[in-house]
A protein has these predicted regions:
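Short, well-ordered coil↔helix boundary/capping segments
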Residues: 79, 89-90
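Short, Lys/Arg-enriched, disordered terminal segments
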Residues: 1, 149-150
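Short recognition helix of helix-turn-helix/winged-helix DNA-binding domains
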Residues: 1-83
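Winged-helix/helix-turn-helix nucleic-acid-interaction surface
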Residues: 83, 92-149
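The alpha-helix within a helix-turn-helix
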Residues: 86
Length: 150
């Protein structure tokens, strides 16, 4: 049976990342969306309360760019072991570690180790969420314009 995964194109926050790193991001983001669904249904197993500055939580909102006050927010995360990622991607653990480091450096994921020698928790910073929301709004706007012209 065929399996399809989302791989972001090399633009926006993904510019400069190689195809393997973007493929790794696609797998992580797919699992993250499942965690978000559970989180929105009230399941707290895949969420963590974090204290963040408003300017970091909402980077694309001009009114909050310089606001350094802190708030507590509930963040969803996903868990993926490096071994599982390597099997999904068809590569070695070393390649997965390199991809994760590239994604961290690009600022599109944040990680936190779950206990000693445990799996990583993957968080997606607001920059990534805002990027995808903006892209969806742009598609909707273009569809409306195309409908008016047709």
């Amino acid at each position: 049976m065929a399996k399809w995964n989302m791989i972001p194109s090399a633009e926006g926050p993904f510019k400069g990342l190689d195809a393997m790193a973007r493929y790794c991001f696609g797998l992580l983001y797919n699992r993250y969306q499942l965690s978000m669904r559970k989180h929105s249904e009230g399941d707290s197993r895949f969420s963590e309360v974090r204290t963040v500055r408003l300017c970091d939580a909402f980077p694309y909102r001009p009114s909050m760019r310089n606001d350094t006050s802190e708030i507590s927010m509930s963040y969803a995360f996903c868990i993926y072991t490096q071994g599982d990622l390597a099997r999904e991607m068809g590569c070695t653990d070393r390649t997965v570690r390199r991809c994760l480091e590239d994604l961290r450096r690009a600022g599109v994921i944040e990680t936190k180790r779950e206990g000693y020698n445990g799996a990583l928790r993957f968080f997606f910073p607001p920059v990534v969420y805002e990027y995808f929301v903006r892209e969806e709004r742009l598609k909707e706007y273009n569809a409306i314009l195309a409908g008016r012209e047709g």
